[in-house]
Amino acid sequence: GTGKSTLLNIISGLIKESSGQVLLNKHNLSNLAEHRRTQIVSRVFQDPSLGTCPSMTVRENLSLALNKGKLLNLRKCLRYKRDFLENLLEGVSLDLKKYLDVQVKFLSGGQRQSLSLIMSCLTNPSVLLLDEHTAALDPKTSNEVIELTNKIVREKNITTLMVTHNLKHALHYGDRLIMLHKGEVVLDVK
């Protein structure tokens, strides 16, 4: 009810802002074509099924993300990207590497959310929006996904906007904390 998801929807271009502008490095994102905006802004939803195709394998989902959603070159992408995908998953704590050829619907919630996160970062977006991306996970898995998130965004230097009700995560991982109440900023701490 405070406008958090609405704010993310506006930034990602899912809904049009009623007033004002969405600026990134002084460039108005609202004026960009949808395909260009999706290259700049990526998003991880609370429900990982919104960012993945559950009936496809982990490898196919990653290949689709690398191909920016085009099925056209999927076979070619699968063939040439095999080593890249396996290396990408090396060190992921939820062990996605051994599940490359398993349909996403058979993965745990943490594995699906990790996959969704990795897919969102494959095209090196400038901004990553995280919408309660660990809310549905148990505390241990939530911490693992947060650690993976932190590792990826730091390695790739991605500006991240995380919506969370977990104050511990916000304080520990955030460089800046903004609290909203009824659509207004009531706290802004760096």
Model-inferred region functions:
Residues 12:
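Helix-to-loop junction immediately C-terminal to a conserved catalytic motif
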Residues 20-27:
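Conserved ABC transporter NBD signature motif
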Residues 28-42, 78:
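ABC ATPase NBD coupling module
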Residues 56-68:
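Q-loop/switch helix immediately C-terminal to the Walker
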Residues 128-131:
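Catalytic Walker B motif of ABC-type/P-loop ATPase nucleotide-binding domains
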Residues 139-141:
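Helix N-cap at the start of a conserved alpha-helix in ABC-type nucleotide-binding domains
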Residues 164-165:
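H-loop/switch region of ABC-family ATPase nucleotide-binding domains
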